[in-house]
Amino acid sequence: MSNTDKERAIAAALAQIEKSYGKGSVMKLGQRPNIDIEAVSTGSLGLDIALGIGGVPKGRIIEIFGPESSGKTTLTLHLIAEAQKKGGTCAFIDAEHALDPAYAKKLGVNIDELIISQPDTGEQALEIADTLIRSGGIDMIIIDSVAALVPKSEIEGEMGDAQMASQARLMSQALRKLTASINRTNCITVFINQIRMKIGVMFGNPETTTGGNALKFYASVRIDIRRIGSIKDKEEVIGSQTKVKVVKNKVSPPFKTADFDIMYGSGISKEGEIIDLGVKLDIVEKSGSWFSYNNVRIGQGRENVKQYLKEHPQISNEIEKIIREKSSKITNINLDQTEEEND
């Protein structure tokens, strides 16, 4: 078959497919209108840089997992706030029945515009999510959490009844159904997940996430979030030092990490990240305990500089802009190459 005949045969096949399934159902990759991946900021400057595209990708499944009280819900509330700033409509499926509206408001979430559902069963939660995604009007949906998506059979059964892998089957079926809708409607779908311990693991990491393996495969980005220390004001604990690691990334190189502070009552400390990344990129100078910007001292001690940046937002925004411009030069934000690469 000559090249001309091949081209005619392909053109005829493409025309037949479009006739059967609609325009745009098949095309050459270079003809796609949006080749660049759009992203929504996470609310953390360091994590945006670690993700490689300035935030979480639109039209993809994201998994955020970690131990209890590590900042999973806080990070997702920041995601909602950032999406709303861009005019997006967000939904929160609260399967844990634990969302605090007052805390969400403090983090910048417009709770009057946030759609919330507190379903009774896992099937109900995922059906609600599917309906909202297929509507095409939702820009971001959060499901909190996978562990709380209890199958109907388990709720209606007796305590102690064996329900072998019923949650894993539910998640596998739901993700098969949701994936195409998520991509078509460009909706960011974030699953919060918990950590469990595998029994009898002698070597390697005994930790695993709930809900089986389906979510690990379908997720384009998986973020591991951990609390690594406390932030104290004299004797009072006022926040948590947090480390996040991008353990899977289909849109940029994975295994990058970022550190940030989560302050109780106000969420991720943007000013703390600006100081740390500013020093790392030689934008902010550090001499002893003093910090300087443009040869002007802006404070002694990290907490004082954070307060200075809060009081001078124009300087804070200026430093942040320079950090984002230089971020392409950062190949490493505490880059942590571990055994997980070989998992």
From Swiss-Prot:
Signal peptide residues on this chain, from the entry's feature table: none
GO biological process: DNA recombination; DNA repair; SOS response
Superkingdom assignment: Bacteria
Primary role: Can catalyze the hydrolysis of ATP in the presence of single-stranded DNA, the ATP-dependent uptake of single-stranded DNA by duplex DNA, and the ATP-dependent hybridization of homologous single-stranded DNAs. It interacts with LexA causing its activation and leading to its autocatalytic cleavage.
Family of this protein: Belongs to the RecA family.
Subcellular location: Cytoplasm
GO cellular component: cytosol
Gene Ontology terms, MF aspect: ATP binding; ATP hydrolysis activity; ATP-dependent DNA damage sensor activity; damaged DNA binding; single-stranded DNA binding
Classification via InterPro entries: AAA+_ATPase, DNA_recomb/repair_RecA, DNA_recomb/repair_RecA_CS, P-loop_NTPase, RecA-like_C, RecA-like_N, RecA_ATP-bd, RecA_C_sf
Pfam families registered for this protein in UniProt: RecA, RecA_C
Binding site for ATP: 66-73
SUPFAM superfamilies attached to this UniProt entry: P-loop containing nucleoside triphosphate hydrolases (SSF52540), RecA protein, C-terminal domain (SSF54752)
PANTHER family recorded: MITOCHONDRIAL DNA REPAIR PROTEIN RECA HOMOLOG-RELATED (PTHR45900:SF1), RECA (PTHR45900)
Protein name, entry field: Protein RecA
Protein encoded by which gene: recA
Major localization class: cytoplasm
Keyword annotations of the record: ATP-binding, Cytoplasm, DNA damage, DNA recombination, DNA repair, DNA-binding, Nucleotide-binding, SOS response
